[in-house]
Amino acid sequence: MNTSRSQAIFGAAQGLMPGGVSSPVRAFKSVGGQPIVFDRVKGPYAWDVDGNKYIDYIGSWGPAICGHAHPEVISALQEAIEKGTSFGAPCALENTLAEMVIDAVPSVEMVRFVNSGTEACMAVLRLMRAFTGRDKVIKFEGCYHGHADMFLVKAGSGVATLGLPDSPGVPRSTTANTLTAPYNDLEAVKALFAENPDAIAGVILEPIVGNAGFIQPEPGFLEGLRELTKEHGALLVFDEVMTGFRISYGGAQAHFGVTPDLTTMGKVIGGGLPVGAYGGRADIMGMVAPAGPMYQAGTLSGNPLAMTAGIKTLELLKQPGSYEKLTATTEKLIAGIKEAATAAGLPFTGGSVSAMFGFFLCEGPVRNFEDAKATDSERFGKLHRAMLERGVYLAPSAFEAGFTSLAHSEADIEATVNAFRESFAEVA
């Protein structure tokens, strides 16, 4: 496979941008080799600057649930852009998307649009503290809530419970109020509440962990968190930036039947354009300026292009049969991957929920980030390169979930499973 143009462009980029990329995972550091530079995307496919075609299971890290460059989304954007790219003032499209989100997501009575998942999580943390008058927050090892200082506490390490920062430039004082617990461990959460009486503003988590691979909540875990937070006067926050509108139209909270107090969103609700949102109970959201005293603002928040793409994407997802198709596609894919790994004699555990999937090259079960670290990352790197050679683009990390879309066909899944068979045999 010729990637000479990708290599040349990435080589030049390294002198222009730190590491040659605008987001670290794109640099392929954890899988080896040089990153692929894309030229265009359409449906379930991506083409690089050398003309190589890939079946894509990243989907722009989640937003492309209808497939890349869906013609109805593109048409709506072409019409919208003629009216301007950003107003810096209210637009009616905000109302439309807000109503769609409120109608779909059980916890959301009011919503505020921002420009990224990180922004949404930053704002919701401030809101949790403002509403409760408390400073401490519990997060879980392996759960990612953006790159804001207060969430950059190293997951799964010996210092995690001490609230020490995971990046230079983050003062210890900033993360001192960030408490961590292993995912799926209710007893650890109970202990943190006992050790910090009347001091914890809330608990935030990915209801399905997608930034430590793919880890599902065990039966009773989410329900237990709901009970604990109510008992201690704390708020429960679901970070649904990844799961929102992906595993069901109402997100993970609708799928699992557990309603948090607040929810953060992103990715799908922008249809591939930069977007984020947070929402929840009306009494809590009433704290947000200008209705209340908790300040948060954004130059491009609620811009007409992101709103347009989000509206059209949600309209497409609401069509009958959308999530049934996504579920069938993903289940067929993960079953095929498992069969291929077993045939090659490799340890494997994996699963899926609707249009989200993941696997580990280790024996299961994987309940938390500590379990996930048992995966064979070196072998995954070899697997990733082997799959690229066979025209399949997976997330360039052993600790990221994968995504399917409405555009993936049965033929795409069959071709992907065949590529896994050959690649697993190669790396076994």
From Swiss-Prot:
Keyword Isomerase on entry: yes
InterPro entries: 4pyrrol_synth_GluAld_NH2Trfase, Aminotrans_3, Aminotrans_3_PPA_site, PyrdxlP-dep_Trfase, PyrdxlP-dep_Trfase_major, PyrdxlP-dep_Trfase_small
Involved pathway(s): Porphyrin-containing compound metabolism; protoporphyrin-IX biosynthesis; 5-aminolevulinate from L-glutamyl-tRNA(Glu): step 2/2; Porphyrin-containing compound metabolism; chlorophyll biosynthesis
Coiled-coil residue windows: none
Keywords carried by this UniProt record: Chlorophyll biosynthesis, Cytoplasm, Isomerase, Porphyrin biosynthesis, Pyridoxal phosphate
SUPFAM superfamilies (UniProt xref): PLP-dependent transferases
Keyword Glycosyltransferase applies: no
Broad class of where this protein is predominantly found: cytoplasm
Gene Ontology annotations of biological process type: chlorophyll biosynthetic process; protoporphyrinogen IX biosynthetic process
GO CC terms, sorted: cytoplasm
E.C. numbers: 5.4.3.8
Cofactors that this protein relies on: pyridoxal 5'-phosphate
GO molecular function: glutamate-1-semialdehyde 2,1-aminomutase activity; pyridoxal phosphate binding; transaminase activity
Reactions the enzyme catalyzes: (S)-4-amino-5-oxopentanoate = 5-aminolevulinate
Modified residues (N6-(pyridoxal phosphate)lysine): 267
Quaternary structure note: Homodimer.
Homology family: Belongs to the class-III pyridoxal-phosphate-dependent aminotransferase family. HemL subfamily.
UniProt xrefs under PANTHER family: GLUTAMATE-1-SEMIALDEHYDE 2,1-AMINOMUTASE (PTHR43713), GLUTAMATE-1-SEMIALDEHYDE 2,1-AMINOMUTASE 1, CHLOROPLASTIC-RELATED (PTHR43713:SF3)
Protein name per Swiss-Prot or TrEMBL: Glutamate-1-semialdehyde 2,1-aminomutase
